[in-house]
UniProtKB/Swiss-Prot annotation:
Protein name, as recorded: Seminal vesicle protein SVP-2
Propeptide: 104-132
Membership in a protein family: To the SVP-1/-3/-4 precursor, particularly in regions where protein processing must occur.
Organism expressing this protein natively: Cavia porcellus
Highest classification ranks of the organism: Eukaryota, Metazoa, Chordata, Craniata, Vertebrata
Any Gene Ontology CC annotation: extracellular region
Length: 132
């Protein structure tokens, strides 16, 4: 696990040199690191992820980025589904990708102990929306 973290740090620092302006934004920095975790799981679709999450001019861009952290586990788990769905539209519509992932919220509650703890007994179907 430690080795994986070192690899991620090296990748992240290399990227921040090429995109220092983006890395200065706290939200982008957080998502940037999360994206590294996804790429270590599967390099498939990384260009799609970048297009979706770096559309900073889109009003929903930041909202999608924040949800991305909550949905990190299920996003990796359902990566193929997400790409097949949203990728067909070129991956350029953050809202579509957001809605596609949102459909998996209930499943995420089942597989993630962390999310169950954060929900504090709330309706699992609504807990993610409440935390956004």
């Amino acid at each position: 696990h430690l080795a994986l973290l070192l690899i991620l740090e090296n990748q992240a620092s290399g990227r921040r040199l090429r995109g220092s302006a983006r890395a200065q934004d706290p939200v982008v920095s957080r998502v940037w690191h999360k994206e590294e975790v996804e790429e270590s799981e599967s390099s498939r679709g990384q260009d799609f992820d970048k297009r979706r999450f770096w559309e900073k001019d889109d009003p929903t861009g930041e909202h999608v980025s924040v949800r991305h952290e909550h949905l990190e586990k299920s996003h990796i788990r359902f990566k193929e589904d997400s790409i097949d769905d949203s990728g067909s539209a070129g991956g350029l519509n953050p809202s579509k990708g957001h809605l596609r992932l949102k459909r998996h919220d209930a499943m995420e509650e089942l597989v993630s102990v962390e999310d169950q703890a954060l929900a504090n007994g709330a309706d699992p179907g609504k807990s993610n929306m409440q935390r956004v």
